[in-house]
């Protein structure tokens, strides 16, 4: 008889605990009732990227000294740096620089450790394409500055977004 009574007591405690959990989750749901949705009509409205957003990498060919620090600090050895040694001036001459954004993890190590600041992160994040070989950017494509979202008159930027206010 005693095991049956303790079983009913445990059942009662479990019922109270379950009701408390349901009540807590219901209160969380009610706290979100007055909030506005954060839906953005993507092609026509865009949220301005944060200040430290890690988008496409911009490369300045004239500043690069072909030191290959970017390759050494990259966790996947991604940047391809081709250079030749100029014997008369005893310096490296950069021939080609490319990054495959299909493989890049956008960690920003190459930008952070570059001694000449020839690499920088842009706000461009629309890199989608149908052919993955188009994601391999050479020094010409990397040197192209992205069109700013703010300057594009066809896109309405979302400045009063709750996501921006929280950051």
From Swiss-Prot:
[4Fe-4S] cluster 2 binds at residues 74, 104, 107, 110. GO terms for molecular function: 4 iron, 4 sulfur cluster binding; iron ion binding; NADH dehydrogenase (ubiquinone) activity; quinone binding. Gene3D superfamilies: 3.30.70.3270. Keywords: 4Fe-4S, Chloroplast, Iron, Iron-sulfur, Membrane, Metal-binding, NAD, NADP, Plastid, Plastoquinone, Quinone, Repeat, Thylakoid, Translocase. It is an enzyme of class 7 (translocase). Residues 55-84, 95-124 form the 4Fe-4S ferredoxin-type domain. Its EC number is 7.1.1.-. InterPro entries: 4Fe4S_Fe-S-bd, 4Fe4S_Fe_S_CS, NADH_quinone_OxRdtase_chainI, NDHI. The keyword Repeat applies. Binds 2 [4Fe-4S] clusters per subunit. Its cofactor is [4Fe-4S] cluster. Pfam families: Fer4_9 (PF13187). [4Fe-4S] cluster 1 binds at residues 64, 67, 70, 114. It catalyses: a plastoquinone + NADH + (n+1) H(+)(in) = a plastoquinol + NAD(+) + n H(+)(out); a plastoquinone + NADPH + (n+1) H(+)(in) = a plastoquinol + NADP(+) + n H(+)(out). GO terms for biological process: photosynthesis, light reaction. NDH shuttles electrons from NAD(P)H:plastoquinone, via FMN and iron-sulfur (Fe-S) centers, to quinones in the photosynthetic chain and possibly in a chloroplast respiratory chain. The immediate electron acceptor for the enzyme in this species is believed to be plastoquinone. Couples the redox reaction to proton translocation, and thus conserves the redox energy in a proton gradient. NDH is composed of at least 16 different subunits, 5 of which are encoded in the nucleus. This is NAD(P)H-quinone oxidoreductase subunit I, chloroplastic.
């Amino acid at each position: 008889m005693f095991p049956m009574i303790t079983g009913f007591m445990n059942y009662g405690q479990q019922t109270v605990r379950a009701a408390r959990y349901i009540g807590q989750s219901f209160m969380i749901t009610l706290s979100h009732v007055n909030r506005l949705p954060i839906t953005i009509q993507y092609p026509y409205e865009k949220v301005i990227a944060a200040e430290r957003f890690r988008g496409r990498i911009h490369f300045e060919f004239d500043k690069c000294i072909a030191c290959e620090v970017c390759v050494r600090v990259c966790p996947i050895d991604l940047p391809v740096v081709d250079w030749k040694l100029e014997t008369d001036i005893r310096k490296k001459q950069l021939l080609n620089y490319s990054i495959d954004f299909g493989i890049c993890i956008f960690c920003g190590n190459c930008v952070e450790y570059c001694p000449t600041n020839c690499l920088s992160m842009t706000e461009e994040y629309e890199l989608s394409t149908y052919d993955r070989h188009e994601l391999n950017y050479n020094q010409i494509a990397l040197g192209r500055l992205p069109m700013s979202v703010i300057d594009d008159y066809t896109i309405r930027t979302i400045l009063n977004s709750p996501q921006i206010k929280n950051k």
